[in-house]
Amino acid sequence: MNKKGLLLVNLGTPDSPHPDDVKAYLKEFLSDTNVIQMPRLLWQPILRGKILPKRSFKSAELYQKIWRKDGSPLMVYAKKQVEQVQQLQPNWIVRCAMTYRKPNIAETLKEMRLAGADDIVVLPLFPQYSVTSTQSVIDQVRKADKNINIVKSFYNDEAYLDLLARDIREAWAKNDYDRLIISYHGVPESYVRRGDPYVDHCTATTQGVLERVGPLTPDNTHQVFQSRFGPTEWVKPYLSDTLRSLPSQGIKRVLVATPAFVADCLETIEEIHVENHDIFKQAGGEVFDVVQPFNEHIDFSKYIASLANRHFAQN
């Protein structure tokens, strides 16, 4: 009887918040040609000469603010998700890996094979597919082991939408909010023009939430994008611009949800809770609350196990 294996993959995190480790992480991340779609001969001198020397120290300061005693929040939650799924499915071999830094995807797959996993499903923890995230996982997996089933997205999966809508519904009911802000990680506009379906996937997720949460409509919900990097145009509207403009329209009480992030990380803890919170308050906003990502919620781990089971069945 074949032994099943499940590999959960997220983006990655530095080994520590020290500038040298942050630099190593950023170098690997920003050298990925799926992420930065420029000729290497043009991009690498810019990356090594200008971006890494400055951004490594700035990012290290941010990581130092969010780092926990037990490590990077993203890694902490990744391990807890693995533990929970392993408890739910004791006969599986369940592991986590990161697209960048450690644990390495290829090395983890090899270890799973040696442990006896014959039938492996890889689940990138990016609900909405993008060339900049999911495709890099696919490329690494295919290079390491071609006989593996990969879940390419789950942005419109009914069970995922039900979980997401439940959390948003419960949070919305706790206060008298003027608007729900649904914020997704952004991508360059040029990538979408070249065929990346990411924005369509985001819009479908937003629509799925609206269909499930009665009080929400297109009139009291904004879909926006965050985490812009560099001088080029990214998909709009930008989260920061939206938050600056709302208070002057009398919209001063907002709830923010981040469906693209299944676990807390720098983009949610620092960028949402601190930077964008301050932007909204400085513009005259009064209430700024955030729907927590799934993190270690057991219902999400049950969903992961169920989703993987469906993909095992397809093999």
Curated annotation (Swiss-Prot):
Subcellular location, record wording: Cytoplasm
Primary localisation category: cytoplasm
Biological processes per GO annotation: heme biosynthetic process
Lyase as UniProt keyword: yes
Source organism superkingdom: Bacteria
Residues binding Fe(2+): 185, 267
UniProt record similarity statement: Belongs to the ferrochelatase family.
Matches recorded under HAMAP family: Ferrochelatase
Name of the protein this chain belongs to: Coproporphyrin III ferrochelatase
Protein source organism: Leuconostoc mesenteroides subsp. mesenteroides (strain ATCC 8293 / DSM 20343 / BCRC 11652 / CCM 1803 / JCM 6124 / NCDO 523 / NBRC 100496 / NCIMB 8023 / NCTC 12954 / NRRL B-1118 / 37Y)
Species lineage: Bacteria, Bacillati, Bacillota, Bacilli, Lactobacillales
